[in-house]
């Protein structure tokens, strides 16, 4: 695809460290981006660090969580937002961007789209960053089961590995 000029960059999604290593061992052209679920309850520090160390950029999907937005109601997130006079969503997005993670929050509402963009104006300090890091739960909002077929050859472990 790159050689045929059909694309300039290659990215992967939901690749674990093991999957990235396996891909890179045989790849002539390495991917430049790994899109993974990241939010305050699923921070994936080990995978993010590995991606950085190997030159992969990281994109966070579901950066605000999902399923009723429990992440946005977390007392730590709310407190950080209040401290900066911003919304909880803006606080979470600012936290991710401060970690040099690309964010792709989903919204179809114009006001929320504006608010999400305005998160670029929120500057968190070291204490805020530590507080946000403290609420890690290793809790996926998307387990990937939607991509599996009942009689298919793959399991959720095949998708995520040991990560």
Feature names for model-found ranges:
Residues 1-163:
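Beta/alpha (TIM)-barrel catalytic core signal, keyed to glycine-rich beta->alpha loops juxtaposed to Asp/Glu
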